[in-house]
UniProtKB/Swiss-Prot annotation:
Compartment(s): Cell inner membrane
A GO term, aspect molecular function: sodium:proton antiporter activity
Organism name: Geotalea uraniireducens (strain Rf4)
InterPro entries, A to Z: Na/H_antiporter_dom_sf, NhaA
Protein name: Na(+)/H(+) antiporter NhaA
Amino acid sequence: MLKRINLLREFSIPLLAGVLTALVWANVAPDSYHKFNHDHFLGPLSFHFVTNDIFMAFFFAIAAVEITQSCLPGGDMSPLNKALNPLLATAGGVVGPVGVYLALNSLVGSSAFTNGWGIPTATDIAFAWLAARLIFGKNHPVIAFLLLLAIADDAIGLVIIAVFYPDPVLPVAPPWLMLTAAGMLIAFILRRKQVKSYWPYLLFGGVPSWFGLFKAHLHPALALVFIIPFLPHPTREVKHMFEEDPKDYSPLARFEHEWKIIVDFGLFMFGLANAGVGFSAMNTVTWLVFCALLFGKVTGIFVFALLGEKLGFPLPQGMGRRHLLVAGIIAGIGFTVALFVAGEAFTDPVVQGAAKMGAILSIAVFPVAMAAAKLLGIRKRGHSSS
């Protein structure tokens, strides 16, 4: 049974099921879907609010765990020179899509679409990991390179959401951020007191942080990102990203272990709440997002990684330029975070729906990457041509 559950999580089945359910529902009975998503669901709160503003706080918290662990001595981002090439590639994976999006928008788009520049900066960690494993094999160095890139991408994405996509209706109210600062101070004190359960950090640090962001009209889904680094953890990391250390019983490790399965299956809710767009909603912004993900990602990542080589920061051993090219294509799968940003970038439901469709269509990058790998003679690790 456990093996089947892990298989469902590994292939992101809950998220895909939520997306497909939302697409069918929104196209067959759009009024019913809209009513379910935006009417009262939990008391006065809508299903969309519960999903995007409360549940997604735990999604971003899991990303924050990986970033925190990766920065520890022995982690994938430590020492920094080991991570410089993938980090430079990450910068290219942001600059490239933004450049392609804005350039195409100036040629064939509209000023109404400009705010969507942040959508194609995201890389979906789960789908990128799955695609890389299927193309390269389980232990290929591309896996670690791509995961590090995706995690760093998420960190940049969090900054983009927080800084560039505040509430479009209500102005930012900075004084309320004192609540978030208070939550961080409480978490710091709990750590100094060596509190070993993660629950006090969530309740006494996370809740004020959430309300502070909410009242400041910034996105409360980022609330736990400010708290997670305070959870006690080992002074040294002995595993790679998304692996588990059976000897690590720290609050940080327990939080990830106990909440990751909830988040993985809860992504059904996210897909259901955010992917319900009509196929008729597709317009120019759909293709701006899709093309920026497909062409901008691979171009930016490839060029910046090669620049890193020229500066003396080589690719990981066993990873060549053809592997880099395919990794750049895989990174064009935006999906989860791209859907989230699309919901924040546009208030017009027609434009928002079209942008979300571009994020959903980015899953088509997967077969493009597989075809490119075949053309370049790449096989799963263990074959002589890999």
